[in-house]
Amino acid sequence: MGKRFSESAAKKAAGLARKRDQAHAKQRAQMEQLEAEEASKWEQGSRKENAKKLEEEQKRQEKARAKKERDALLTAEEEQLGKGGKGKRKMK
């Protein structure tokens, strides 16, 4: 004859619980590995600066510097010429 259910029920339940625990541990390990990989990708991404943004910032600074130079030249020229008075009126 065979074994009775009452004899093998505890053994079967223990085996299922062990398999369930192993599956949870495996899944937890996979999630931790994925999180570690994603964290390393974020770290690598944060190290590099965006080249396009750097170029735009450099252009903006260059434009601001050029404008300051133009303004300085304009004020120097105005000071050199002196304050302009009224011009001679032409008689008609």
UniProtKB/Swiss-Prot annotation:
Keywords: Coiled coil, Cytoplasm, Nucleus. It is found in: Nucleus; Cytoplasm. Signal peptide: none annotated. It comes from the Eukaryota. InterPro entries: LSO1/2. GO terms for cellular component: cytoplasm; nucleus. Disruption phenotype: Mild slow-growth phenotype in response to reduced iron levels. Displays global translation defects during recovery from stationary phase with translation of most genes reduced more than 4-fold. Ribosomes accumulated at start codons, were depleted from stop codons, and showed codon-specific changes in occupancy. GO terms for biological process: cellular response to nutrient; cytoplasmic translational elongation; intracellular iron ion homeostasis; ribosome hibernation. It holds the Pfam family LSO1_2-like. One of its GO terms (molecular function) is ribosome binding. Induction: Constitutively expressed. Expression is not regulated by iron unlike the LSO1 paralog. Residues 1-10, 38-72 have a biased composition (Basic and acidic residues). Residues 1-92 are annotated as: Disordered. Residues 17-80 form a coiled coil. Ribosome-binding protein involved in ribosome hibernation by associating with translationally inactive ribosomes. Required for translational recovery after starvation from stationary phase. May facilitate rapid translation reactivation by stabilizing the recycling-competent state of inactive ribosomes. Belongs to the CCDC124 family. Associates with translationally inactive ribosomes in the nonrotated state. LSO2 bridges the decoding sites of the small with the GTPase activating center (GAC) of the large subunit. This position allows accommodation of the DOM34-dependent ribosome recycling system, which splits LSO2-containing ribosomes. This is Protein LSO2. It comes from Saccharomyces cerevisiae (strain ATCC 204508 / S288c). The gene is LSO2.
